[in-house]
């Protein structure tokens, strides 16, 4: 544990030393600083897991991911490092998924947590554009590039949740509200309200889009269809058609958002999600309705 902790501290101090040299002399390339900060954020996770092992805490405990995320996010905002922010958001998303899956007894609460995390990502992203970007009079502000990781992770979680919500076999049976779900929903409500009140213009459309996607997902889960795979009725037709149309619209919105924000990752993620979703729907849902090559072509 001591060796890992010393390595983490050395990486953290070394990264900021390199950042200081670059700021004053311009001799250290920025990728080196970013890589060093990323190594420090990864090493912090190693410290946590090593400490957990020493204390006989199971390595698969989701709280370790949550602590890792908090530490990486703290480093990112203290030292304005993009690499720690990406690591913090990825581990935070993994914590939301792992912790809800471990504690939930139903599908609806898991999807609600993922949709709420997507709303948080979209809301925090536009708040970065509104207040904390660098510019005249704010040379020490948080870089506007911090908005892109929040938007990307939030959009990814929204697409994953909507993908799962479109599966007819997922229902609201045994629905229970846990303390963790309440906390995530409250945080999402606060971030959403702050984005609507404080942001201006088209920035407001991003959290609204995430909210609309969440509401669509709830409708798909609560809509009971696909109970009998051998008999396809009007409800199954309607559910499948609504799911495909909704996913196309949401994925298209995220792809367009990637163009408007000049963030290629969003467009790539939305395109890949749409292809995977269409393929899955073709063979898992629509196979009982339309057969042959026309199935995929139509979708």
Q: Which sequence ranges carry the predicted segments?
A:
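Alpha-helical multi-pass membrane segments and their bilayer interfacial helix-loop junctions
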Residues: 1-299
């Amino acid at each position: 544990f001591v060796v890992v902790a010393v390595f983490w501290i050395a990486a953290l101090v070394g990264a900021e030393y390199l950042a200081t040299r670059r700021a004053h002399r311009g001799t250290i390339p920025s990728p080196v600083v970013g890589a060093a900060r990323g190594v420090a954020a990864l090493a912090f996770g190693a410290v946590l897991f090593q400490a957990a092992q020493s204390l006989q805490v199971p390595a698969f405990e989701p709280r370790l991911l949550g602590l890792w995320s908090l530490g990486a996010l703290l480093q990112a905002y203290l030292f304005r490092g993009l690499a720690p922010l990406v690591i913090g958001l990825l581990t935070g998303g993994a914590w939301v998924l792992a912790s809800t899956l471990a504690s939930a007894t139903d599908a609806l609460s898991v999807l609600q947590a993922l949709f709420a995390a997507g709303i948080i990502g979209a809301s925090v992203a536009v708040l970065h554009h509104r207040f904390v970007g660098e510019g005249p009079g704010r040379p020490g502000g948080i870089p506007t590039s911090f908005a892109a990781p929040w938007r990307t992770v939030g959009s990814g979680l929204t697409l994953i949740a909507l993908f799962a919500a479109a599966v007819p076999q997922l229902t609201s049976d045994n629905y229970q509200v846990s303390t963790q779900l309440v906390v995530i929903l409250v945080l999402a409500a606060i971030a959403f309200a702050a984005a609507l009140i404080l942001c201006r213009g088209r920035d407001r459309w991003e959290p609204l889009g995430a909210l609309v996607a969440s509401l669509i997902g709830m409708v798909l889960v609560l809509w009971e269809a696909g109970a009998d795979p051998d008999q396809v009725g009007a409800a199954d037709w309607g559910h499948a058609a609504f799911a495909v149309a909704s996913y196309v619209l949401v994925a298209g919105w995220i792809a367009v958002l990637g163009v408007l924000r000049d963030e290629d990752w969003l467009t790539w993620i939305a395109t890949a999600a749409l292809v995977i979703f269409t393929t899955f729907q073709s063979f898992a849902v629509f196979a009982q309705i339309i057969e042959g090559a026309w199935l995929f072509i139509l979708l």
